[in-house]
């Protein structure tokens, strides 16, 4: 029998809300997964993509990852992973670096057998390339088979990738498909195949209200079930969600009273305003929450404001602008060069004066089909540059 931890969407390096503490929180959550794997003696840790939040993680993020994966190596627990959409590069992947160090294995179309189960990997594939993608995989002689992949698959919400078609085109029958990308954990069954999302290990957006965690997946030849999927929650940073539905005369004082009713110490506080009421200044609410011990406070005003007879309805949100932009960019279905430009413009580590030059470099590299120049930003992007 094979028993593995199925995790993903760890988003290491994400300095959410521009808070260094949140960057550490994402690392701590991944650390907790690794610790559980060793304590429980699982057969493998299977990561379904988006180990990193960005395709250019900082050196500190790389070193922290190495430090966390070494105990797994010492415990003889393999770390099996695929590449997600956030971290994918044009050339060698970060997983390739860890593989050369003996710390990870990048799953592909060849079986990686753990106990009695063969694991295969399917990296994130952009929508424009899926119709031409070859889903042929090598055969195996294990008792069970599982596919690990990253993307928004049917039959789950927000899907744009037909899993039925993938399974039909695959040359191996899978007992389970272990997925990443959707941060909401969920499980379904397509015919005889179990399909499951593990969810994220930390809250990457204010919409992720449920506890974070990972899956434990067991493969056996039991007469009742071949695949068993269970959940394990992680002890992550406390998020306090305050939903304030304002009446006609309510305003800042009403929201402050709601905050007084809650324990805010060291928490990320997310205030969502709906209803009617007076004008509320987000900065005033944020200062109030922070003064009461919150790590940080964000206000999300969902009310509609009419600024004139012919003015359109406006939905104003202050909760997580970076997350909102990322989601909008993703919804637009932009190709990789366009997503590169978006990341450059929003990179708060890049001086404003350098943005124009960096965008021009990217554009010229794409036009010349020069992938090396496209990644020429001074950071190592291949295994060879690390050696």
Swiss-Prot record:
One of its GO terms (biological process) is DNA repair. Residues 366-375 have a biased composition (Acidic residues). NCBIfam families: Mre11_Halo. Pfam families: Metallophos. Part of the Rad50/Mre11 complex, which is involved in the early steps of DNA double-strand break (DSB) repair. Mre11 binds to DSB ends and has both double-stranded 3'-5' exonuclease activity and single-stranded endonuclease activity. This is DNA double-strand break repair protein Mre11. The gene is mre11. Disruption phenotype: Mutants show a slight growth defect, but do not show increased sensitivity to ionizing radiation or alkylating agents. Show decreased rates of survival after UV-C irradiation. Display extensive delay in the repair of DNA double-strand breaks. Binds 2 manganese ions per subunit. Its cofactor is Mn(2+). CDD domains: MPP_Mre11_N. Mn(2+) 2 binds at residues 50, 85, 150, 181. Nuclease activity is regulated by Rad50. Homodimer. Forms a heterotetramer composed of two Mre11 subunits and two Rad50 subunits. The active site is at 86 (proton donor). InterPro entries: Calcineurin-like_PHP_ApaH (IPR004843), DNA_Repair-Maintenance_Comp (IPR050535), Metallo-depent_PP-like (IPR029052), Mre11_archaea-type (IPR032885), Mre11_Halo (IPR054879), Mre11_N (IPR041796).
């Amino acid at each position: 029998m094979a028993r593995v931890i199925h995790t993903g969407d760890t988003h290491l390096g994400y300095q959410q809300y521009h808070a260094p503490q949140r960057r550490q929180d994402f690392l701590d959550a991944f650390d907790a997964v690794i610790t559980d794997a060793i304590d429980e003696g699982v057969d493998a840790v299977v990561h379904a993509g988006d180990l990193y939040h960005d395709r250019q993680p900082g050196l500190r993020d790389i070193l922290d990852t190495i430090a966390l994966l070494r105990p797994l190596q010492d415990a003889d627990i393999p770390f099996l992973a695929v590449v997600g959409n956030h971290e994918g590069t044009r050339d060698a992947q970060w997983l390739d670096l860890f593989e050369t160090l003996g710390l990870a294995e990048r799953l592909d179309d060849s079986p990686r057998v753990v106990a009695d189960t063969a694991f295969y990997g399917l990296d994130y594939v952009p929508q424009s390339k899926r119709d031409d993608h070859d889903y042929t995989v090598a055969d195996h002689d294990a008792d069970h088979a599982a596919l690990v992949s990253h993307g928004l698959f049917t039959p789950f919400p927000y899907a744009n990738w037909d899993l039925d078609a993938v399974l039909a085109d695959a040359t191996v029958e899978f007992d389970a498909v272990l997925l990443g990308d959707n941060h909401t954990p969920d499980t379904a069954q397509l015919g005889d195949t179990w399909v499951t999302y593990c969810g994220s290990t930390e809250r990457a957006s204010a919409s992720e209200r449920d506890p974070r965690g990972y899956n434990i997946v067991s493969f056996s030849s039991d007469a009742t079930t071949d695949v068993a999927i269970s959940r394990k929650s992680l002890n992550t940073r406390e998020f306090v969600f305050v939903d304030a539905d304002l009446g006609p005369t309510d305003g800042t004082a009403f929201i402050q009273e709601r905050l007084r009713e809650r324990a805010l110490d060291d928490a990320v506080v997310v205030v969502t305003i709906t209803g009617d009421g007076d004008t509320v200044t987000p900065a005033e609410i944020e200062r109030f929450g922070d003064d009461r011990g919150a790590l940080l406070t964000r206000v999300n005003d969902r009310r509609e404001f009419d600024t004139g007879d012919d003015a359109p309805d406006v939905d104003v949100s202050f909760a997580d602008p970076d997350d909102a932009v990322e989601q909008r960019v993703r919804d637009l279905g932009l190709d990789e060069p366009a997503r590169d430009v978006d990341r450059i413009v929003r990179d708060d580590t890049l001086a404003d004066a350098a943005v124009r030059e960096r965008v021009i470099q990217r554009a010229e590299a794409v036009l010349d089909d020069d992938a090396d120049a496209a990644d020429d930003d001074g950071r190592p992007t291949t295994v060879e540059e690390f050696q």
